[in-house]
Amino acid sequence: MVDAGSFKNGITIQYENGIWQVIEFQHVKPGKGSPFVRAKLKNIISGGVIENSFRPTEKFDLAHIDRSEYQYLYADGDLYNFMNTETYDQIALSADQVGDSLKFVKENEMVKLCSHEGNVFAIEPPISVELEVTETEPGIKGNTATGATKPAIVETGAKIMVPLFVNQGDKIKIDTRTGEYTSRA
């Protein structure tokens, strides 16, 4: 059990016959009236987002989420195949289940599959990945004073913005949470 006053980003709760993840929360103490917690919740199955206000003492059951290490094997049409590296069990997920969470993940890399009661609802890629730039325009030295970027396509097909000094064939590090360039590899 957790009360609304103890909300943290990322926790999952059971609310209104569903499993919801707290995306954002804010403690509000108005000048008049009692304090409340304003929270933005995301349904982990449907992906729907709601905003709601709760009394800080309102109690919720925590939902148990399994995060298991799996190896991303390959894509076969609209199915993406993963293997549990401990049990060697394989699982195939549809493109709808995967979404764009694999846009920075190469085949044979490790990911975490998040599930509730056996139903996979999210894929957590590694926080930082190294990828090769397959396509980008050449950067012209002296074009700018600071911080200029250009579009680049990496080996997984994802498009990101990189600094001008990055060239085709360079290996770069990308933060998968934001999709931003972090450094050269």
Swiss-Prot record:
Which superkingdom is the protein from? Bacteria
Any single biological process term in GO: peptide biosynthetic process
What are the GO cellular component annotations?
cytoplasm
Annotated S-S bridges: none
What the entry lists under SMART domains is as follows: EFP, Elong-fact-P_C
Molecular-function annotations in GO: translation elongation factor activity
Q: Could you tell me where this protein is found in the cell? A: Cytoplasm
Q: According to its UniProt record, in which pathway does this protein act? A: Protein biosynthesis; polypeptide chain elongation
Q: Which UniProt keywords apply?
A: Cytoplasm, Elongation factor, Protein biosynthesis
> What family does the database annotate?
Belongs to the elongation factor P family.
Instruction: State what this protein does.
Output: Involved in peptide bond synthesis. Stimulates efficient translation and peptide-bond synthesis on native or reconstituted 70S ribosomes in vitro. Probably functions indirectly by altering the affinity of the ribosome for aminoacyl-tRNA, thus increasing their reactivity as acceptors for peptidyl transferase.
Checking HAMAP family in the record gives: EF_P (MF_00141)
PANTHER family attached to this UniProt entry: ELONGATION FACTOR P, ELONGATION FACTOR P (EF-P) FAMILY PROTEIN
Q: What is this protein called?
A: Elongation factor P
